[in-house]
Amino acid sequence: MVEQKGNILMKRYEIGKLLGQGSFAKVYHGRNIKNSQSVAIKVIDKEKILKCELMDQIRREISVMNLVRHPCIVQLYEVMATKTKIYFILEYVKGGELFNKVRRGRLKEEVARKYFQQLISAIDFCHSRGVYHRDLKPENLLLDENRNLKISDFGLSALAECKRQDGLLHTTCGTPAYVAPEVINRKGYDGAKADVWACGVILYVLLAGYLPFQDKNVINMYKKICKAEFKWPSWFSSDIRKLLRRILDPNPATRISVSEIMEDPWFRVGLNSDLLNKTIPTDKVDKVVHVDMDSTFGNLSNNINEGKQEAENLTSLNAFDIISLSSGFDLSAMFEDENSKEESKFTSTNTATTITKKLEDVAKNLRLKFLKKNGGLLKMEGSKPGRKGVMSINAEIFQITPDFHLVEFTKINGDTLEYQKVKQEMRPALKDIVWAWQGEQPQPQSLNEQS
């Protein structure tokens, strides 16, 4: 169905005016026909999220919103689906974004503290359930009719089960100005500590009316973030400065935790004791939404070709990932030591299938074992041990757009000189699929010129 004002969705909800839209979804005001309750209806296009490999992200968003049912978090009431659309029926928060309030000027200290207390309470609740938001910013903080805070947009959230064996998260997420130094570093990071950093940036913004880390040059901004280089507004009290110093600590190991923030004297002024409870009264939240994932998402994979099926397994890059992976913007050199693994990258206008086939052919010609892994990860291994064991190279394909990919080589094991030799032999053999090696000028070819 085409969503228009006055349409009835599955005989249960009346669709009202359009509230907002993005690349993959539109959000409408809605009304529950049975009880006249106002709701927000998020309409997601199945085909678009399938093409951009966001199906798992949508599934995760449903799972996360069921885990974090808290008065300061936007509630998910129901999930419905047709053959082409997925519908999230959400709590309607009519007070607008906290960002719009800050845009008119900085907040009074007691008002900023109230919102910060509610934010920390909700984040503490999320973390206690193994959920990390990873995209906290004023634009994702809404206000209800009573001017209470509601966290929204769990699309980038990570579950504790998404951690690797080292107990850390490894996917770069978030909005650059609010991202923690260790996330920019592109090493593993603690999701809880990264959320704490973002909360600190938000508190600064609420009290100052502007960001702590600003620069027209994004690289300079990242350097400031990594060094926690910012200035104190004259109106910041000593108690606020003391707390923010501990939150905006560039070292996650010594950065203050959520539980420590909740014990801070400035934080506890006028604190509502209900916010300290991880167990929320059942009358303040709605029941858990039970979703049949198979019927909601359907078997869409049968409707796509082999090339798209392969693309579904790739890692998708958001804008921050692309900046981080780009040679001109990669700040990892600021942190890595001489013993870090060697990497090289190239971009390609070919499909993932074509890139994989070419890499397999080149590996065979160089007498390397070739193995396909999940998530667009390919592995090449030498046939016999060298000075430092068997050389092992990972080649990972990232999708930037459906027609544009980034391939990253990483030496996992073996002798560096042997790796450099193999890499030099691979470069001319890969020329047919390489648009540009990172750090070099691209070939004079537009993305539209590919055959």
Curated annotation (Swiss-Prot):
Q: Which PROSITE patterns match?
A: NAF (PS50816), PROTEIN_KINASE_ATP (PS00107), PROTEIN_KINASE_DOM (PS50011), PROTEIN_KINASE_ST (PS00108)
- Which ranges carry the NAF domain? 304-336
> Which UniProt key words apply to this protein?
ATP-binding, Kinase, Manganese, Nucleotide-binding, Serine/threonine-protein kinase, Transferase
Region Activation loop: list its residue ranges.
153-182
What Pfam families does its record include? NAF, Pkinase
Q: Please give the residue ranges the record annotates as the region PPI.
A: 341-370
Biological process terms from the Gene Ontology for this record are: signal transduction
Reaction equation(s) it catalyzes? L-seryl-[protein] + ATP = O-phospho-L-seryl-[protein] + ADP + H(+); L-threonyl-[protein] + ATP = O-phospho-L-threonyl-[protein] + ADP + H(+)
Q: Which cofactor does it need?
A: Mn(2+)
- Induction field: By salt stress and abscisic acid (ABA).
For this UniProt entry, the molecular function terms from Gene Ontology, in alphabetical order, are:
ATP binding; protein serine kinase activity; protein serine/threonine kinase activity
Q: Which residues form the signal peptide?
A: none
Residues that, per the record, bind ATP: 19-27, 42
Q: Does the keyword Transport apply?
A: no
Q: What is its EC number?
A: 2.7.11.1
Q: Which domain of life is it from?
A: Eukaryota
Q: Which InterPro entries match?
A: Kinase-like_dom_sf (IPR011009), NAF/FISL_domain (IPR018451), NAF_dom (IPR004041), Prot_kinase_dom (IPR000719), Protein_kinase_ATP_BS (IPR017441), Ser/Thr_kinase_AS (IPR008271)
Class of the enzyme per the UniProt entry, highest EC level: transferase
Where do the Protein kinase domain residues begin and end? 13-267
This molecule's function is given as: CIPK serine-threonine protein kinases interact with CBL proteins. Binding of a CBL protein to the regulatory NAF domain of CIPK protein lead to the activation of the kinase in a calcium-dependent manner.
Q: What is known of its domains?
A: The activation loop within the kinase domain is the target of phosphorylation/activation by upstream protein kinases. The PPI motif mediates the interaction with the ABI (abscisic acid-insensitive) phosphatases.
Sequence similarity:
Belongs to the protein kinase superfamily. CAMK Ser/Thr protein kinase family. SNF1 subfamily.
Q: What name has this protein been given in UniProt? A: CBL-interacting protein kinase 10
**UniProt source species:** Oryza sativa subsp. japonica
Gene that codes for this?
CIPK10
